[in-house]
């Protein structure tokens, strides 16, 4: 557990609540907020802590999450978020966590480090199916489905990932659809020795398998494939250095979460690289790509 990296503490004093476990110590406990609420009632244990640290505190606008924060009687409260934004409910964050005390300038942070931040755009030849071209604003779920099923586009991604693995990089393939995740995972499973597939709803046995793959020796090739929703928050693997953004997004906050998976310090890491697949032939996707470019610049990335 990473807490042991920063605290001089007996591991037996670190408790866990959530993920099927309930072993609190009352000293330092790590809990899933969802595990602290049952049938609308907040677990009494919440009131016993003196210091509350809320990761991804932008979720406090959700009713059940705010209930947990309100039930706490902690003297000290710390909220952490990479994606706080004014959404009409943002005042709840400040009510529960207090004012913003510190901001990290992503561009300055990137410039200070010894790790280069690079983006490599890969322009695809993707075109919308005829059935979607008649709509003034084609529905995005249908667009994503068409992207996921485009063989030429998937071939491009597949070749790029294999080349990265050949160059001894540690790649993360990110998609927004479970059917695309399954397709990509099946294809790579025949070519890469260690493949970890991450998505919501994994069984305990599947999670153990993923953990064993993630722990593979650095001398062995390894590929992580995940849905953005799963990896957007809380995932930590310092070995990752290459991101394949296979589905278009536009909001800078989401982009910051995704590329942030690469920013952990790790021995021998000299650069991080994002492969961005730009579908320039589709106006709405081209506009999303333009927003990502602005987002990359704000995050201290350079376009190759």
Feature locations, PLM:
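Conserved helicase ATPase core of P-loop NTP-dependent helicases/translocases
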Residues: 13-25, 41, 172, 182-183, ...
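Conserved helix/coil segment N-terminal to the catalytic DExD/H
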Residues: 18-51, 62-67, 230
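Structural recognition of the conserved hydrophobic beta-strand(s) that form the central parallel beta-sheet
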Residues: 29-32, 75-82, 223-227
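A short beta-strand element within the Helicase C-terminal
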Residues: 47-50, 224-226, 233-248, 257, ...
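Post-DEXD/H (motif II) to motif III coupling segment of the RecA-like Helicase ATP-binding lobe
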Residues: 50-51, 58-121, 296
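Conserved SF2 helicase motif VI
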Residues: 83-84, 250-274, 292-293
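Conserved interdomain hinge at the start of the Helicase C-terminal
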Residues: 135-176, 182-187
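C-terminal helicase lobe
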Residues: 142, 265-304
């Amino acid at each position: 557990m990473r807490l042991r990296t920063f605290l001089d503490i007996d591991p037996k004093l670190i408790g866990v609540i959530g993920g099927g476990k309930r072993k609190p110590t009352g000293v330092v406990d790590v809990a899933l907020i969802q595990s602290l609420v049952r049938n609308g009632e907040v677990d009494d244990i919440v009131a016993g802590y003196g210091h509350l640290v809320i990761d991804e505190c932008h979720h406090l606008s959700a009713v059940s999450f705010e209930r947990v924060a309100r039930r706490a009687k902690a003297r000290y409260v710390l909220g952490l978020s990479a994606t706080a934004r004014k959404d009409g409910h943002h005042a709840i964050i400040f009510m529960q966590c207090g004012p913003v005390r510190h901001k990290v300038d992503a561009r300055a942070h990137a410039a200070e480090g010894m790790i280069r931040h690079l983006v490599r755009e890969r322009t695809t030849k993707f075109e919308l199916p005829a059935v979607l071209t008649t709509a003034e604003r084609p529905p995005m779920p249908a667009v994503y489905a068409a992207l996921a099923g485009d063989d030429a586009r998937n071939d491009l991604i597949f070749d790029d990932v294999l080349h990265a693995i050949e160059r001894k990089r540690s790649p993360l393939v990110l998609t927004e659809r479970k059917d695309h995740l399954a397709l990509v995972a099946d294809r790579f499973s025949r070519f890469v020795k260690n493949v970890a597939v991450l998505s919501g709803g994994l069984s305990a046995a599947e999670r153990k398998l993923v953990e064993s793959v993630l722990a593979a020796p650095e001398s062995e090739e390894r590929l992580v494939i995940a849905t953005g929703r799963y990896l957007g928050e809380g995932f930590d693997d310092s070995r990752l250095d290459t991101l394949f953004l296979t589905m278009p997004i536009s909001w800078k906050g989401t982009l910051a979460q995704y590329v942030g998976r690469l920013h952990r310090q790790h021995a021998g890491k000299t650069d991080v690289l994002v492969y961005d697949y730009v579908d320039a032939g589709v106006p709405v996707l081209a506009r999303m790509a333009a927003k990502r470019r602005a987002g990359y610049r704000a995050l201290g990335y350079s376009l190759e």
